[in-house]
């Protein structure tokens, strides 16, 4: 999508679908825009999307990079996929969990989220990836190429046969 010059701006679990052989499909492009912004400035400016998946720069009504805000939302989706709950309510100063990330206290963020989880539930690679994807400063967030090169992404891959066996 980004390679085609499009930013989604409303990525959330409800908009991530799978076909019958578990290929990922993205749905609902109602808020999509050119990744360089509608005015060609290189930035998007409108506050659109589902608030709990919005990057902080959107909440702050700053011009934003479409790819960066989409990857921020992907970090939230990935966290939910792993834990079955979001990492925070909204990426704003008032949210205690997001405030920890803003203050560079990822250690406390992960300590809080590790309560009631088995020891080692979150791998260091997973924590590193999610922390970077949810960075307050969009220039500190990884690109898709960075994510694909990340150790967590390159880890063990579940095969289609594994998935189908799980649902059999």
Question: Where are the regions a protein language model picked out?
Answer:
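Catalytic-loop of the protein kinase fold
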Residues: 2-18
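Conserved activation segment of eukaryotic-like protein kinases, specifically the C-terminal portion
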Residues: 45-58
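Conserved end of the kinase activation segment
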Residues: 58-68
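Hydrophobic anchor on a C-lobe helix of Hanks-type protein kinase catalytic domains
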Residues: 81-82
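C-terminal lobe of the eukaryotic/viral protein kinase catalytic domain
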Residues: 86-135
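Terminal C-lobe "cap" of eukaryotic-type protein kinase domains
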Residues: 135-140, 144-160
């Amino acid at each position: 999508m980004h390679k085609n010059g499009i930013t989604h701006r409303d990525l959330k679990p409800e908009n991530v679908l799978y076909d019958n052989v578990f290929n990922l499909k993205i749905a609902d492009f109602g808020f999509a825009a050119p990744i360089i912004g509608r005015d060609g400035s290189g930035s998007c400016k409108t506050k659109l999307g589902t608030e709990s998946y919005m990057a902080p720069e959107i909440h702050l009504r700053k011009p934003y990079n479409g790819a960066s805000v989409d990857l921020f939302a992907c970090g939230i989706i990935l966290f939910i996929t792993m834990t079955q709950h979001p990492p925070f309510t909204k990426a704003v100063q008032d949210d205690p969990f997001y405030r920890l990330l803003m203050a560079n206290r990822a250690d406390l963020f992960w300590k809080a989220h590790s309560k009631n989880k088995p020891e080692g539930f979150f791998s260091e690679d997973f924590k590193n990836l999610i922390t970077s994807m949810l960075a307050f400063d969009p220039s500190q967030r990884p690109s898709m190429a960075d994510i694909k090169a990340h150790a967590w992404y390159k880890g063990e891959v579940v095969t289609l046969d594994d998935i189908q066996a799980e649902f059999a």
